[in-house]
Amino acid sequence: MKKSVDFIGVGTGPFNLSIAALSHQIEELDCLFFDEHPHFSWHPGMLVPDCHMQTVFLKDLVSAVAPTNPYSFVNYLVKHKKFYRFLTSRLRTVSREEFSDYLRWAAEDMNNLYFSHTVENIDFDKKRRLFLVQTSQGEYFARNICLGTGKQPYLPPCVKHMTQSCFHASEMNLRRPDLSGKRITVVGGGQSGADLFLNALRGEWGEAAEINWVSRRNNFNALDEAAFADEYFTPEYISGFSGLEEDIRHQLLDEQKMTSDGITADSLLTIYRELYHRFEVLRKPRNIRLLPSRSVTTLESSGPGWKLLMEHHLDQGRESLESDVVIFATGYRSALPQILPSLMPLITMHDKNTFKVRDDFTLEWSGPKENNIFVVNASMQTHGIAEPQLSLMAWRSARILNRVMGRDLFDLSMPPALIQWRSGT
């Protein structure tokens, strides 16, 4: 007999993990979360040394809406007997290793996460008025589902396939290549690119013969962490943003890009000091090249390595670069889950690759109103620059659970706005 529950989450990344953590406060809610991996892991390939979060630790799984929930980061510190040393360390942000360990600790304590359960298909049973979730370990019925399968690593069109010497940054710590004596090129001017460049500079994977850092941006730009920029990452801002016309939303997202895609000031200063010490104090050979304003247009195999053809955006110059190892820190892109062919005829799309998402993170679809398809990390175009970030995940999770339960279990009422983002407010 197939088990029937109130809610099934597909994927156990931080966003669905946040929903799972908050759901433990709701005794009458029966929910399950499935993941294809054998255990919890969060971007294991990017857990490189001296790599820090861009958000403060209080923006954890639960604290923004339920600070007494046992899955808070503060409780993690207490349970691991490091609360006082953490405070004494005066860390502005925590390392990715520690935040990953916090997420793993929370996941291992929950009894409604099922690993090695690959979701293969989701259909809707019209007779039962329930979603049918087919997994590698059996079938389940659910009144609501939440898609949290994440985004896919993005590689430029010039990259035809990945190899041992040409790959995405998300695999760096899994591959741990020996870069000793090799010419290295890091492509991508965001935080991941900065983290890889700094570690390569320090010889984390061996002393490289040459290191190049290529970015499309016109400089290695800092993350915009100004106080008023942080207001973009509040529920008040999202409520105003979502009601704007589509072209205005696109314009704002372009303007706000450096609030999420820039490099922390600490990272930039650390890199600059490393370069100063290497070249001005130790007087080492200048085997480092910083190459902004360039796009890699062609990637060709060249002997045991690679030849990169680049185009300069400002002076239209063309350059070539020989490299033994090329690492693309080029981010992630949305991809439609491959488990929805049965449901797709019922779902309203914004375009062929983008769902039409309502304010409450449900998809528009032609099924019964009491059955909801929720999505997380799939609606930046409608919900703002904060959507793919951790900053508002607890608030979003609470909003989803309030909708599932049909009442406000979590108080999400907003204080008077500091900034009047819309006219008439």
Swiss-Prot record:
Q: What GO molecular function annotations does the UniProt record carry, in alphabetical order?
A: L-lysine 6-monooxygenase (NADPH) activity
Would the keyword Cell membrane turn up in this protein's UniProt record? yes
* Cofactor field: FAD
> Which UniProt keyword terms apply here?
Cell membrane, Cytoplasm, FAD, Flavoprotein, Membrane, NADP, Oxidoreductase, Plasmid
- Pfam families on file: Lys_Orn_oxgnase
Localization, per the record, is: Cytoplasm; Cell membrane
Which positions are annotated as binding FAD? 8-14
Q: What is its EC number?
A: 1.14.13.59
Pathway in which the depicted protein is active: Siderophore biosynthesis; aerobactin biosynthesis
Record's superkingdom? Bacteria
* Major localisation: cytoplasm
GO biological-process terms attached to the record: aerobactin biosynthetic process
GO CC terms in record: cytoplasm; plasma membrane
Q: Which reaction is catalysed here?
A: L-lysine + NADPH + O2 = N(6)-hydroxy-L-lysine + NADP(+) + H2O
* Protein family (similarity comment): Belongs to the lysine N(6)-hydroxylase/L-ornithine N(5)-oxygenase family.
Q: What does this protein do?
A: Flavoprotein monooxygenase required for N-hydroxylation of lysine. Involved in the biosynthesis of the siderophore aerobactin which is a chelator that mediates the high-affinity iron transport systems induced by the organism under iron-stressed conditions.
| Name this protein carries in UniProt | L-lysine N6-monooxygenase
Species assigned in the record: Escherichia coli
Q: What taxonomic classification does the UniProt entry list for its organism?
A: Bacteria, Pseudomonadati, Pseudomonadota, Gammaproteobacteria, Enterobacterales
Gene that this polypeptide is encoded by: iucD
